[in-house]
Amino acid sequence: MKYQQLENLECGWKWNYLVKKWKEGESITCHIDSSEADVAVQALLKLEHQPTGVLEWISDNMSPELDNKLKQAIRAKRKRHFNAEQVHTKKKSIDLDYRVWEKLSQRANELGCTLSDAIEYLVSEASRSEQASKTVTNLKEDLSKLLSDDK
């Protein structure tokens, strides 16, 4: 699925991605000389609010090894951004203990589905089981009434 590209927004994401990688200690520039790399990074840091400048910096200074990773990160961010606009595509998060997640993951693998589908399946099964239990209880009550009325 294609998502609309919003240049200013995505430039901000690119700037954040590059600064994050730099802070993590990764080499984000194509420069071998550390002084050139430092100058390029300082120039990048000054471009926070200049989207077109970020694109220019990327074409002039970014490490080629980082190009594919940056594109993937921006594609994922774009998808999350547009999916967050609609309730049915927005991702929700829940906290699970590791052992619970592990059991859920195993069940999802057995069913051959996603974790979300497995949760949905388990909830519907629990609902069906509860309904069947109520039906059995009602039948027992009706049967005991019939038997007690006969005497």
Curated annotation (Swiss-Prot):
Question: What is the official name of this protein in its record?
Answer: Macrodomain Ter protein
Q: Where in the cell is it found?
A: Cytoplasm
Organism of origin is Vibrio atlanticus (strain LGP32) (Vibrio splendidus (strain Mel32))
What GO cellular component entries does it have? cytoplasm
Keywords for this entry?
Cell cycle, Cell division, Cytoplasm, DNA-binding
Q: What does this protein do?
A: Required for spatial organization of the terminus region of the chromosome (Ter macrodomain) during the cell cycle. Prevents early segregation of duplicated Ter macrodomains during cell division. Binds specifically to matS, which is a 13 bp signature motif repeated within the Ter macrodomain.
Q: Which family does it belong to?
A: Belongs to the MatP family.
Q: Which gene encodes it?
A: matP
Could you cite one Gene Ontology molecular function of this protein? Answer: sequence-specific DNA binding
Pfam families listed in its UniProt record: MatP (PF06303), MatP_C (PF17414)
Keyword DNA-binding in record: yes
The keyword Transmembrane helix is annotated on this UniProt entry: no
Q: Describe, as the record does, how this protein assembles with itself and its partners.
A: Homodimer.
Q: Name one GO biological process term.
A: regulation of DNA-templated transcription
Q: Which residues form the signal peptide?
A: none
The family database entries (InterPro entries) matched by this protein are listed as:
Arc_rbn_hlx_hlx, MatP, MatP_C, MatP_N, MatP_N_sf
